[in-house]
Amino acid sequence: MSDDEYGDIDEDVWDVAEALTQASQTLPSNSPHRRKRRRISSDQELDDYNDDGLSIQQRRRSRGSASSDHDEGDEKRQSKYRIHLGAEEVPAAVIMGATQADGMPDSSPYRIRGPIYKRPRPLPSPELEPKSTQALASVFRPTKAQKQNIVPQPAPAAAYDFSKELEDLPSDAFSPSPPQQGMSTGLITINSSPPFESTQSIISQRLVAPQNGLRQTTLFGGRAPNQAPSSTQAKKVHNYLVDKVPEPPTHHSLDREAIKTWVYPNNLGPERRYQYTIVHKGLFNNLLVALPTGLGKTFIAATIMLNFFRWTKNSQIVFMAPTKPLVSQQVKACFEIAGIPRSSTTMLTGDQTPALRAEEWDEKRVFFMTPQTVENDLKTGIADPKRIALLVVDEAHRATGKYAYTKVVEFLRRFNKSFRVLALTATPGSTVEAVQEVIDNLEIAEVEIRTEESIDIKEYVHRRDITEILIDPSDEIIMVRDLFSKALQPLVNLLCSQKAYYNKDPMSLTQFGMLTARKTWMASGAGKSANMGVKGMMNALFTVLTSMGHAIKILNFHGIGPFFSNIKDFRAEVEGNKKGGKYKNQVVNDPDFKKMMDRIQSWINKEEFIGHPKLTHLCDTVLNHFLDAGAGLTGDNMPPSSTRVIVFTEYRDSAEDIARVLNKHGPMIKASVFVGQSDSKRSEGMNQEKQLETIRKFKAGGINVIVATSIGEEGLDIGEVDLIVCYDSSSSPIRMLQRMGRTGRKRAGKIVLLLMRGKEEDSYKKSKDNYEQMQRMISSGSRFTFRHDLSARIIPRDVKPEVEKRFIEIPPENTQDPSLPEPKRRAKARKKPAKKFHMPDGVETGFRNASKLNGNVAGPPSRIFGIKRKPNELNDDELAPIPLLDSVLLSGRDMAELDRRFLRVPDGALEEVEMPDLTAQTITQRSLTMTAKVSHGKYTRKCVDLFSKLSRSQASEDRDIKPYGDEAPSDLGKMPTMPLEAELARIPKAPKPTQVSKLPQVTKTTSAPKKTPASRKAIPKKAPTRRNRPLQHENSDSEDSTASMAMVSNLRSSQIPQPTPDSEEEGPGERVDRTSDMEDLEASDDSDLGSLVDFIDPTQIQTQMTLTGTSSFSSSPPQMERWDGDERQKRRGRGGLLGRAVERDKAKNLSSQRSIPTMTQESSDDDLPTIEDLVRGDTTTKKTVDFPSSSVLSSGKKATPNMFTRKRDGDVRGRGAKRRIVDSDDSDE
């Protein structure tokens, strides 16, 4: 036997392990009492078991081979699911299979396979150590979970305790030995799961679900510390690929070639990975970038602006910064880094007029502006919100409340759904709520935040040494505090007596504390139930002590000088009786207050007096810094110092006091204040021009120390600043980080904090801890809700731009002119443009009727509200496109269609086109019908209006005789006929008239006038109205024909005999002229339209005339026919138009035989059709019928139907005997 077959285990240990290979064995009992050790079988049975054809060594050799005896059918039938078996059905061999190998040959499931080991070498067996024995026993001891879930099967013999058999085994009894022939080298995993047969390698596979019931041990065999048990259910995490929300296409015009790539400039040297990542994410998401100062936020903004400038054709890009110095700083970055052309760039502030800004919005594409200017231009309509594609917001932590940043984004969202937002800041906010408000107001979808400890920016962050100097108050400050405290003590005691304030130390007063106490007292029961006198007293106390709290803060943190200036203003107000009061006078007149003011006045008069110990440490720090930098060397050829210092303070009075003290150490120190634009009571503000001039001198070396207020905390990029001195501390982490970020941009910097021991020291620690906590929260993103729904991609989803890293060529125009791209004022100032109202897409404009407010009306807004769009004006200079020749020539098929439909007519059809019948569709003529392409003209509308008004103006009995009537008379068969032959024989010829009488003029009145017979007195001529006369006569030369017609009518009416009252025969009556008709309609609104006579020019109608082919006027009246009963029945039977046509034919034949013209006068156009031919379409000869005159109607006689029949057949043709033509400009179809 070779050495490889031996292990490190003693032979006696192997003999003990052989006892475990019994054929039938059950699990240990769950009984709490220990059972006795007892043999289950004799030695002979054990020997038989060893000799049954499968020895122990053979089984040991066969562990390395896989179970090759399984047929393929068993493998196919094996399911991936297992059936759970109860504890009583699980054999001991399966439960204890953790010590067995999977590759054993088939055997009884109740047989326990031998342990994995190697035979020990023949050496003296060492003594077993108790620790190893206990460790090995712990491996085989069943766990608590197994004891609870396993119930032993009943057996004839008592259960055997296996753990006692293995107590003497060492800890490395089952460690693997060098591989033997036929034995696997794979590792065996001990677990609580039952072994499964597999044809694969015996190397254990890791399961996804966590395993239960395991006990972890250390490398030396000891038990690992207990941990919380894992859940029985495996925690599965599914990474589903959710489809993105469909996004409507952008309305911006994109360059399809440019959007295939995005440019990353290499002008500034090697690439920074964090900048590349932020730029790539900012191109497709609304991004909030939070980077420490000096890490290239300006470069990131310029790169994104460059790509949007390339991608869009005419869209606009807006960069907003709170101050003009920050705006000008970004302008230079875009010119020198991104290479955006200067001709497309402008910088607009409130200094430019609205008219000048309107020109820039029409011509430029890139704008650098303050947020207030952008807001005003959007509200007035100067800027088009739909054209803005990118909005860059610098110092984004200001976007809270009602600041202009918030209003601009809100205004853009109303009109524009597709624009990108890039927000830049160093400190997003000091609280979770503030950061969430910034995210909501700017519609942020992603956040890229880095701290100074981030791995990818550590190599670019310069070292900053922060030094904290704790200062105690001076003796002068302590003396002033004591005197001031005594002066305020009575007021504080009075306030505490009302239980409104509980701290009786006046030096602990603060503005915030007083405001909070006042609000609390007013809301309490004592404040609500107090009378007006008490409320007035409390309000006065709170007001005085609040102002005193501000003065105490200045005294403690800024010095005696600023404190004296504040108190002096307070005293001046009281002594000048401007805002005097009981309690203010009490403070001013207090002896301790007067003593304090006198002492301060004597100190300030001394030049060497320094009002606060901070000033002493400040001067020492600044002087040492310049001496270390070599600035103290003097000489003619010495260059100016390259180091710079910035001192930050909160108040303007303190800044002026600091600059005064520092300038005493000149010329080494040249200090200047840097404040805002507003003026205070004691100092003048700095406009933007002065601010830019101060920064320019600071960079050039003319000024080496700037004493700045909060205006200098944000955004100033002055790379040579090596020392920052914080004269006062702030509890806001935003302000502290902004101050510290002014140094360490291009080289290592130093920060010195001057802190008063106590409250100011605590404020700084608070801000520092708050900053670190907020950075961790923002980085995790678990506490914030981002607006992914409002972040549009703008670029189509099918387009994936690829990066193009290249050197950007700067246009020559960007370097030739170093000035800012501010628009210059024109010689002639333009007027302020009118306000424009931009409408969102799909908005409803106009007014909606109340009947359509239910929202059920579908269609475009123009159809809902009846909006008439103005047609686009055609450009006269623009040439019409010339079509192709084949598109305008007729093809063979078109020629066949032309010949079939238009050149040939079917057999039997008339080849002549008749005149249109104006009485065919009278109802349709009174209203406008629908049109498809060509709308109705103005003359068509006038004619339709005329026809409808004429129809409304007629009485019900007159509609039948008018040319525009629709209904036939219902009593046509009852009308008698006059014997025309007899009447013509009796009536003599009428003498020639010597004087023509004119018709009376119709006068418009508001009430119906009295009807009078026609007068023969001449009246003035009525001037024709061309506007209301679309129908004109061909030869209208005069207006005398109207009088001639009236004369003829009167002569005929005088010659016709009138029937007696008893006679059944009706006389012809008088002619119904238009005067009586118009008199009936004068009271109506439409009476001013006149009648058809007004539209007919009667100048060509003579007193007596004879028309060829028609009836003529005669001096003798026609004979009237008498109708008998049979004839009346026949006429009634024929009825309507048919009977009228038959009667007309008879009258025509009789008139042609009897009528003798008395006067012949032919005009040059007698061959033309008459008005009746145009109206009725009948050019045949018609019977002359007299009409009843106006005298008959005016005399009170009843008009008979026969009168109107004659009127329709005769007088219409007499009055309109000439042809009328239609004016050429009245035709619109």
UniProtKB/Swiss-Prot annotation:
UniProt-listed Gene3D superfamilies: hef helicase domain (1.20.1320.20), P-loop containing nucleotide triphosphate hydrolases (3.40.50.300)
Biological processes per GO annotation: double-strand break repair via synthesis-dependent strand annealing; interstrand cross-link repair
Gene: mph1
UniProt region (Disordered), positions on chain: 20-85, 811-855, 952-1229
Name of this chain's protein: ATP-dependent DNA helicase MPH1
Top EC class of this enzyme: hydrolase
The entry's keywords: ATP-binding, DNA damage, DNA repair, DNA-binding, Helicase, Hydrolase, Nucleotide-binding, Nucleus
Keyword RNA-binding: no
Residue ranges occupied by any Helicase ATP-binding domain in the UniProt entry: 278-446
